[in-house]
Amino acid sequence: MTLEAYFPVLIFIIFGVVLGIALMSIGRILGPNKPDPAKLSPYECGFEAFEDARMKFDVRYYLIAILFILFDLETAFLFPWGVALREIGWPGFIAMGVFLLEFIVGFVYIWKKGALDWE
């Protein structure tokens, strides 16, 4: 496949970036700029904020998010593998078996280390 086949994609990306920058610039130039304390305060259910809007999150939230992404990617690899299993044969089956075994070992490791405990 030659690079000429990707030329429409490049044009589409350039057009999207230019259009996005143009629309944001027009909004910045033509939009009203009247800041006041009520507009700059964080909104919380119709009341004044009880605490600072930027609270520290527990590290466990990030850990759960990273684990979700990892296992979501695992699922993203499993679907095409399942569709193409007849064409790829035993080598593909063994490769996915090793891949799944690594994930299972990693999951058991983080479970035994207590990374999934919320106490």
UniProtKB/Swiss-Prot annotation:
Question: Which purpose does this protein serve, as stated in its record?
Answer: NDH-1 shuttles electrons from NADH, via FMN and iron-sulfur (Fe-S) centers, to quinones in the respiratory chain. The immediate electron acceptor for the enzyme in this species is believed to be ubiquinone. Couples the redox reaction to proton translocation (for every two electrons transferred, four hydrogen ions are translocated across the cytoplasmic membrane), and thus conserves the redox energy in a proton gradient.
Q: How does it assemble?
A: NDH-1 is composed of 14 different subunits. Subunits NuoA, H, J, K, L, M, N constitute the membrane sector of the complex.
Q: Single GO cellular component annotation? A: plasma membrane
Q: Name one GO molecular function term.
A: quinone binding
Q: Which reaction does it catalyse?
A: a quinone + NADH + 5 H(+)(in) = a quinol + NAD(+) + 4 H(+)(out)
Please tell me which top-level EC class this enzyme sits in: translocase
Annotated keywords:
Cell inner membrane, Cell membrane, Membrane, NAD, Quinone, Translocase, Transmembrane, Transmembrane helix, Transport, Ubiquinone
Chain ranges passing through the membrane: 7-27, 63-83, 88-108
- This protein is called NADH-quinone oxidoreductase subunit A
Give the Enzyme Commission number: 7.1.1.-
Q: Does the keyword Cell inner membrane apply?
A: yes
Native species: Cupriavidus pinatubonensis (strain JMP 134 / LMG 1197)
User: Where does this protein reside within or beyond the cell?
Assistant: Cell inner membrane
Q: What is its main location?
A: membrane
Keyword flag Transmembrane: yes
- Membrane topology, from the record: Multi-pass membrane protein
Q: Which family does it belong to?
A: Belongs to the complex I subunit 3 family.
Q: Which gene encodes it?
A: nuoA
Pfam families linked to this entry: Oxidored_q4
